[in-house]
Amino acid sequence: MADNPKAPTFIKEGSGDLESQRRNEQVNREVGELVTRKSLSDQLRENSKKKRQQFQRQTKEKNSFTRVSNDDLDHINKVKLDELEKLRNFSQWAESEERNRRKQLQLLQQPSTPEHTNKQVISKNDPIPTSIKVRKLKTSNGAKNALGVISKPKHKKTDRTQKK
Protein backbone atom coordinates (compact mmCIF):
# COMPACT_ATOMS: atom_id res chain seq x y z
CA MET A 1 0.00 0.00 0.00
CA ALA A 2 0.99 3.58 0.12
CA ASP A 3 3.73 4.54 2.54
CA ASN A 4 2.91 8.26 2.64
CA PRO A 5 -0.82 8.77 2.55
CA LYS A 6 -1.54 12.37 1.60
CA ALA A 7 -4.62 14.10 2.85
CA PRO A 8 -6.90 15.01 -0.01
CA THR A 9 -6.70 18.68 -0.84
CA PHE A 10 -9.67 20.49 -2.25
CA ILE A 11 -9.01 23.29 -4.65
CA LYS A 12 -11.46 26.07 -5.41
CA GLU A 13 -12.87 25.85 -8.86
CA GLY A 14 -11.16 28.27 -11.19
CA SER A 15 -7.99 28.78 -9.17
CA GLY A 16 -5.56 25.92 -9.43
CA ASP A 17 -2.70 27.76 -7.80
CA LEU A 18 -2.52 27.41 -4.02
CA GLU A 19 -0.37 30.48 -3.65
CA SER A 20 -2.93 32.75 -5.34
CA GLN A 21 -5.64 31.23 -3.15
CA ARG A 22 -3.62 32.00 -0.01
CA ARG A 23 -3.05 35.59 -1.18
CA ASN A 24 -6.78 36.05 -1.76
CA GLU A 25 -7.55 34.75 1.74
CA GLN A 26 -4.96 37.14 3.23
CA VAL A 27 -6.49 40.12 1.39
CA ASN A 28 -9.98 39.13 2.57
CA ARG A 29 -8.74 38.93 6.18
CA GLU A 30 -7.16 42.37 5.94
CA VAL A 31 -10.34 43.87 4.51
CA GLY A 32 -12.35 42.27 7.32
CA GLU A 33 -9.98 43.79 9.87
CA LEU A 34 -10.44 47.21 8.28
CA VAL A 35 -14.20 46.87 8.52
CA THR A 36 -14.05 45.94 12.18
CA ARG A 37 -11.71 48.84 13.01
CA LYS A 38 -14.34 51.47 12.16
CA SER A 39 -15.38 53.87 14.87
CA LEU A 40 -18.78 53.60 16.49
CA SER A 41 -20.10 56.71 14.74
CA ASP A 42 -18.97 55.35 11.35
CA GLN A 43 -20.68 52.03 12.05
CA LEU A 44 -23.91 53.77 13.09
CA ARG A 45 -23.80 56.02 10.03
CA GLU A 46 -23.28 53.01 7.76
CA ASN A 47 -26.08 51.05 9.43
CA SER A 48 -28.52 53.96 9.10
CA LYS A 49 -27.56 54.34 5.44
CA LYS A 50 -28.17 50.62 4.81
CA LYS A 51 -31.52 50.72 6.63
CA ARG A 52 -32.60 53.82 4.70
CA GLN A 53 -31.72 52.15 1.40
CA GLN A 54 -33.56 48.99 2.43
CA PHE A 55 -36.63 51.04 3.44
CA GLN A 56 -36.54 52.92 0.12
CA ARG A 57 -36.38 49.62 -1.79
CA GLN A 58 -39.33 48.25 0.18
CA THR A 59 -41.32 51.46 -0.33
CA LYS A 60 -40.59 51.44 -4.04
CA GLU A 61 -41.68 47.80 -4.29
CA LYS A 62 -44.86 48.49 -2.29
CA ASN A 63 -45.72 51.53 -4.39
CA SER A 64 -45.22 49.57 -7.58
CA PHE A 65 -48.13 47.36 -6.46
CA THR A 66 -50.44 50.10 -5.17
CA ARG A 67 -49.91 52.90 -7.67
CA VAL A 68 -51.54 53.04 -11.05
CA SER A 69 -49.44 53.64 -14.13
CA ASN A 70 -50.15 56.58 -16.43
CA ASP A 71 -51.53 54.30 -19.15
CA ASP A 72 -53.92 52.68 -16.70
CA LEU A 73 -54.97 56.08 -15.37
CA ASP A 74 -55.65 57.32 -18.92
CA HIS A 75 -57.74 54.23 -19.61
CA ILE A 76 -59.77 54.71 -16.41
CA ASN A 77 -60.41 58.36 -17.26
CA LYS A 78 -61.46 57.40 -20.79
CA VAL A 79 -63.94 54.83 -19.43
CA LYS A 80 -65.37 57.44 -17.03
CA LEU A 81 -65.81 59.94 -19.88
CA ASP A 82 -67.51 57.28 -22.00
CA GLU A 83 -69.92 56.52 -19.16
CA LEU A 84 -70.71 60.22 -18.74
CA GLU A 85 -71.33 60.55 -22.48
CA LYS A 86 -73.68 57.54 -22.40
CA LEU A 87 -75.53 59.09 -19.47
CA ARG A 88 -75.89 62.41 -21.31
CA ASN A 89 -77.14 60.67 -24.44
CA PHE A 90 -79.65 58.68 -22.41
CA SER A 91 -80.95 61.79 -20.63
CA GLN A 92 -81.31 63.61 -23.97
CA TRP A 93 -83.16 60.61 -25.39
CA ALA A 94 -85.44 60.47 -22.33
CA GLU A 95 -86.21 64.18 -22.62
CA SER A 96 -87.06 63.86 -26.31
CA GLU A 97 -89.30 60.87 -25.58
CA GLU A 98 -91.02 62.87 -22.84
CA ARG A 99 -91.61 65.76 -25.26
CA ASN A 100 -93.05 63.37 -27.85
CA ARG A 101 -95.31 61.79 -25.25
CA ARG A 102 -96.55 65.21 -24.12
CA LYS A 103 -97.29 66.19 -27.72
CA GLN A 104 -99.23 62.99 -28.30
CA LEU A 105 -101.12 63.50 -25.05
CA GLN A 106 -101.93 67.05 -26.09
CA LEU A 107 -103.18 65.86 -29.48
CA LEU A 108 -105.37 63.24 -27.81
CA GLN A 109 -106.85 65.76 -25.39
CA GLN A 110 -107.77 68.26 -28.09
CA PRO A 111 -111.44 68.18 -29.09
CA SER A 112 -112.05 66.71 -32.52
CA THR A 113 -114.75 69.20 -33.57
CA PRO A 114 -113.72 71.96 -35.96
CA GLU A 115 -115.22 74.60 -33.67
CA HIS A 116 -112.42 74.08 -31.16
CA THR A 117 -109.40 74.62 -33.35
CA ASN A 118 -107.44 76.65 -30.82
CA LYS A 119 -104.44 74.78 -29.43
CA GLN A 120 -103.77 74.40 -25.75
CA VAL A 121 -100.27 74.94 -24.50
CA ILE A 122 -98.90 72.41 -22.03
CA SER A 123 -96.06 73.55 -19.84
CA LYS A 124 -93.49 71.26 -18.26
CA ASN A 125 -94.96 71.89 -14.82
CA ASP A 126 -98.43 70.59 -15.72
CA PRO A 127 -99.09 67.22 -14.11
CA ILE A 128 -99.65 64.33 -16.46
CA PRO A 129 -102.20 61.74 -15.35
CA THR A 130 -100.52 58.42 -14.78
CA SER A 131 -103.56 56.31 -13.90
CA ILE A 132 -106.84 55.76 -15.70
CA LYS A 133 -110.04 55.54 -13.68
CA VAL A 134 -112.90 53.40 -14.96
CA ARG A 135 -116.33 54.20 -13.59
CA LYS A 136 -118.53 51.35 -12.50
CA LEU A 137 -121.89 51.16 -14.16
CA LYS A 138 -124.88 51.25 -11.85
CA THR A 139 -127.15 48.36 -12.60
CA SER A 140 -130.35 47.26 -11.04
CA ASN A 141 -131.11 43.71 -9.91
CA GLY A 142 -133.20 43.19 -13.01
CA ALA A 143 -130.33 44.20 -15.26
CA LYS A 144 -127.98 41.90 -13.35
CA ASN A 145 -130.31 38.96 -13.87
CA ALA A 146 -130.55 39.84 -17.52
CA LEU A 147 -126.78 39.67 -17.73
CA GLY A 148 -126.72 36.25 -16.07
CA VAL A 149 -125.44 37.45 -12.71
CA ILE A 150 -127.16 35.70 -9.83
CA SER A 151 -126.76 36.98 -6.31
CA LYS A 152 -128.11 35.64 -3.05
CA PRO A 153 -130.94 37.63 -1.50
CA LYS A 154 -130.02 39.63 1.58
CA HIS A 155 -131.22 38.10 4.84
CA LYS A 156 -133.30 40.13 7.18
CA LYS A 157 -132.19 40.25 10.79
CA THR A 158 -133.89 37.62 12.85
CA ASP A 159 -134.07 37.02 16.57
CA ARG A 160 -131.09 34.63 16.44
CA THR A 161 -128.79 37.15 14.80
CA GLN A 162 -129.90 39.95 17.10
CA LYS A 163 -129.13 37.96 20.29
CA LYS A 164 -125.54 37.34 19.36
UniProtKB/Swiss-Prot annotation:
Residues 1-72, 95-164 are annotated as: Disordered. GO terms for cellular component: chromosome, telomeric region; nucleus. InterPro entries: FAM192A/Fyv6_N. The keyword Phosphoprotein does not apply. Residues 111-123 have a biased composition (Polar residues). Involved in telomere length regulation and promotes fully efficient non-homologous end-joining (NHEJ) by a mechanism activated in postdiauxic/stationary phase. Transmembrane segments: none annotated. Keywords: Chromosome, Nucleus, Telomere. This is Protein FYV6. Belongs to the FYV6 family. Residues 19-47, 58-72 have a biased composition (Basic and acidic residues). It comes from Kluyveromyces lactis (strain ATCC 8585 / CBS 2359 / DSM 70799 / NBRC 1267 / NRRL Y-1140 / WM37) (Yeast). It comes from the Eukaryota. It is found in: Nucleus; Chromosome, Telomere.
